[in-house]
Amino acid sequence: MKTREVVFYSEGAKMVGDIYLPDDYKEGEKRPAVLCNSGWTGVNKCYPALFARALTARGFVCMGFDYRGFKPSENVHPCLPKYTTLETEVEDVANAFTFMQIQPEVDSERCGLLGWGVGGAVCVNVAARDKEVKAIATLNSFVNGE
């Protein structure tokens, strides 16, 4: 798996992530893509990177990132749980999904979401709002916090 660091912005905050490419990827190709999402803690190097390893081996381009408030993305706050909500994570994932779609390696017509735990609930919320999401998978998830 090849990795390329990316930076984008979500609601004014700098977000840091990675594009994960299959080993056999050739420049100029457009591949289906999956935005891989972590649970509540929003850490890219954990579940998103693990999911990307499995999916890139099957030919997908993947992207993972650290949610707003989790290093190395911006707006880290000492009382993070108070300021990080399902809605802020939905905003971040929606913005990341749009960013992923415009990457040169990505077939923007074949993009989906994958989420673990709270990340799964976030993916369900994003997919319900964005018709560009063509597929969704959740693991160990719930639909809402009520």
Feature-to-residue mapping (PLM):
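Short beta-strand element of the alpha/beta-hydrolase
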Residues: 29-39
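Loop/turn elements at helix/coil->beta-strand transitions in domains of secreted/extracellular proteins
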Residues: 31-32, 60, 133-135
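Catalytic nucleophile-loop/oxyanion-hole region of alpha/beta-hydrolase
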Residues: 44, 68-108
